[in-house]
């Protein structure tokens, strides 16, 4: 789902140069890139706005060897049979016969045994306490990140810091609320029981049931029960962001079996990852929201069940989270070694440039840099040279999705695919990478970049079998030649590409008249590029100037994050930046990205307005693929259709995170597939004392 597409969008687009929806474990759903756009982690989310640069995207991890059984659970047999685990409770009539386990994965086999003591990538002895201060940009006016209205405070959902491309690890739900399952940073689309003690999936996938931990509590001491889970599901589907309705459509009904068991009944053919999606939904306190209108912005700190509570705030300016010493789950295997900071504080700044200066001054402790130019030229200051600030390129092995200039096909100007293709031909990535991004990026060539799901070469026979039913509606070139993008020498001499773009525009019914590109009625082609932060202007203006050479009038408009969110929520734009974040195994987020239902749902991530029979059919094929081979085939076929329909102008990507921090912290030595998870870090008292003293002395 999209817990704030605007920020997601930004993150994406900015990834390379200069936007939760939470998804299945490590899927990287919400959600973006180099200089940046709107995916898949709240509305104006802090770090998200900190800059989208052409550069980043992570994904999940490798599962241990074993039979690829869709939905297989940790501790269960491949057939998922067996009785309830000790203390799990008894299944009532109608939901018996399912294997019981402590974790679940979409494809493959979970790595950890039922009695695992803690995640292998954490430091189980990490000290607790200390403070970390982070930066957010823009402002906020709500503590409800699950609805369209209002701009939510950062830190309520998703990780503490947003990574480029909307990817990253650490709290799929967040730190105030918790979910039934906790995803593993080190496995692909795999999560383990947290609020639940065991999970059961019917052999025929007709239901998924969660047996709850009887000790689960909200921060005010109220017990967390199955009724809270059921109420949350119904409320999110009814009043939450459109993505919830889309992703949860495969549930036919929800029932509670006693106080500690919740059963989700699934429709035939439901999304393969739906059990995981359900397990990663937040669980909200039914009693606390009673009498409150859930569809309205929330101005008071909510009650949660997570490791942190909101201890103080200045609405729109700052918010502080304090670790709850009585947190009920602090000794669970899924919690040990995580959530180590005693206090996490967010200070809000006008934009990314101001936030960077605050970091240099020592007012902010850690920063994820999404602007390539800034990373190359803006981190040469005394604290870096003295070793007080550490600057690191951290590699990840995650799918990076797609980032680009997305075109709103609801607008007449972009309804014609020939026009959209011409926009792609006119974009000189090589010049931008050389002159704007310091050569730090590579071209985005797939909606599943940095993943085996990316389409390459010509369609293989198994892909053709999926594509053939839609052949009449697809470009012939899709079947005849590999997808390519223009490549220049990077010197700005792109006349051949502009000639080709002009030829496409002429085929679309335009012609040049008095140095203007006009249609048959003599109207000049004109449109606006909408941006959420002035940081992105430096990547938009050169593109706009190139388009003016074709006689197109392009206006670059910058609005504040809240207005950007509103405009994109209601699809009131021509072109903007967008990042589609993906994971190793696509989940129901792709329906929110590209389905017909999402095209007409206010606030969805389907900014282009895609409603195409081939896309619709291939989304279904991806979501119902029974094994990795068929998943790969379906995803590659879908990738080809999206590329050849030219819904966006591909920008850039990278497999590194640019992160700088004041040398106050410790972190596990083990490298993560996701690259970076701040939840596993801690304040190192010795380092912090030295660095803080140097900062006070003006270091």
Residue ranges and their predicted role:
Residues 28, 33, 116, 315, ...:
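Ligand/substrate-recognition segments at binding pockets and active sites
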Residues 96-203, 234, 301-303:
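N-terminal lobe/hinge region of extracytoplasmic solute-binding protein
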Residues 122, 126-127, 147-165, 198-242, ...:
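Aromatic- and charge-enriched surface segment that lines or borders ligand/interaction sites
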Residues 136-138, 314-319, 323, 424-485, ...:
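Detector for C-terminal structural segments
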Residues 193-204, 219, 224, 265-284, ...:
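Aromatic-rich, solvent-exposed beta-strand/loop patch
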Residues 209, 213, 296, 329-379, ...:
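Ligand-site clamp/hinge motif
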Residues 211, 245-289, 305-314, 459-473:
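Surface-exposed binding/hinge segments that line
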Residues 253-255, 311-322, 347-411, 421-422, ...:
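Extracellular/periplasmic solute-recognition and catalytic clefts
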């Amino acid at each position: 789902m999209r817990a704030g597409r605007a920020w997601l969008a930004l993150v994406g687009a900015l990834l390379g140069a200069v936007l939760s929806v939470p998804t299945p474990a490590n899927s990287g759903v919400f959600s973006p890139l180099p200089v940046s756009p709107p995916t898949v982690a709240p509305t104006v989310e802090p770090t998200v706005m900190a800059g989208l640069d052409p550069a980043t995207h992570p994904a999940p991890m490798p599962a241990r060897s074993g039979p690829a059984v869709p939905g297989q659970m940790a501790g269960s047999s491949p057939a998922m049979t067996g009785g309830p685990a000790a203390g799990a409770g008894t299944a009532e009539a109608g939901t018996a016969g399912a294997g019981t386990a402590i974790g679940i994965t979409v494809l493959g086999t979970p790595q950890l045994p039922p009695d695992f003591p803690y995640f292998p990538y954490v430091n189980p002895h990490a000290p607790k306490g200390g403070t970390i201060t982070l930066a957010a940009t823009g402002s906020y006016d709500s503590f409800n990140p699950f609805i369209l209205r209002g701009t939510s405070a950062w830190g309520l959902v998703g990780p503490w810091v947003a990574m480029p491309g909307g990817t990253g690890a650490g709290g799929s739900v967040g730190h105030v609320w918790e979910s039934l399952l906790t995803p593993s940073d080190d496995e692909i689309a795999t999560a383990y029981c947290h609020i639940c003690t065991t999970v059961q999936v019917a052999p025929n996938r007709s239901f998924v049931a969660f047996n709850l931990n009887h000790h689960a509590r909200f921060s005010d001491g109220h017990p967390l029960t199955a009724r809270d889970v059921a109420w949350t599901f119904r409320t999110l589907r009814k009043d939450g962001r459109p993505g919830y309705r889309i992703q949860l459509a495969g549930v036919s009904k929800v029932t509670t079996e006693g106080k500690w068991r919740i059963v989700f009944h699934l429709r035939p053919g439901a999304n393969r990852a739906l059990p995981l999606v359900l397990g990663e939904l937040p669980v909200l306190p039914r009693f606390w929201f009673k009498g409150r209108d859930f569809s309205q912005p929330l101005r008071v700190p909510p009650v949660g069940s997570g490791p942190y509570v909101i201890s103080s705030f200045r609405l729109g300016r700052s918010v502080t989270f304090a670790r709850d010493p009585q947190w009920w789950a602090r000794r669970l295997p899924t919690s040990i070694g995580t959530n180590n900071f005693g206090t996490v504080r967010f200070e809000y700044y006008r934009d990314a440039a101001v936030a960077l200066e605050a970091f240099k001054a020592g007012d902010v402790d850690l920063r994820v840099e999404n602007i390539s130019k800034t990373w190359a030229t803006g981190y040469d200051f005394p604290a870096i040279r003295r070793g007080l600030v550490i600057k690191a390129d951290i590699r990840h092995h995650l799918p990076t999705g797609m980032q680009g200039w997305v075109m709103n096909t609801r607008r007449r100007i972009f309804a014609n695919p020939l026009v959209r293709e011409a926009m792609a031909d006119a974009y000189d990535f090589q010049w931008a990478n050389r002159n704007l991004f310091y050569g730090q990026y590579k071209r985005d060539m797939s909606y599943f970049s940095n993943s085996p799901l990316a389409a390459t070469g010509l369609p293989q026979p198994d892909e053709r079998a999926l594509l053939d039913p839609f052949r009449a509606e697809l470009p012939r070139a899709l079947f005849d030649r590999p997808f390519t993008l223009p490549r220049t020498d990077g010197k700005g001499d792109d006349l051949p590409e502009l000639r080709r773009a002009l030829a496409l525009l002429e085929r679309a019914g335009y012609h040049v008249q008095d140095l203007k590109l006009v249609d048959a009625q003599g109207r000049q082609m004109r449109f606006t590029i909408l941006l959420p932060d002035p940081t992105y202007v430096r990547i938009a203006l050169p593109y706009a100037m190139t388009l003016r050479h074709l006689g197109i009038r392009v206006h670059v408009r910058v609005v504040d994050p809240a207005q950007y969110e509103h405009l994109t929520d209601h699809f009131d734009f021509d072109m903007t930046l967008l990042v589609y974040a993906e994971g190793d195994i696509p989940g129901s987020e792709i329906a929110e990205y590209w389905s017909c239902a999402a095209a007409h749902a206010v606030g969805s991530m389907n900014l282009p307005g895609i409603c195409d029979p081939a896309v619709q059919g291939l989304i279904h094929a991806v979501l119902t693929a029974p094994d990795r081979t068929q998943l790969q085939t379906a995803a590659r076929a879908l990738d080809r259709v999206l590329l050849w329909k030219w819904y966006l102008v591909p920008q850039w990507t990278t497999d590194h995170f640019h992160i700088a921090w004041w040398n106050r912290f410790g972190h596990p030595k083990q490298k993560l597939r996701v690259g970076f998870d701040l939840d596993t870090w801690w304040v190192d008292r010795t380092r912090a004392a030295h660095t803080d003293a140097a900062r006070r002395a003006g270091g």
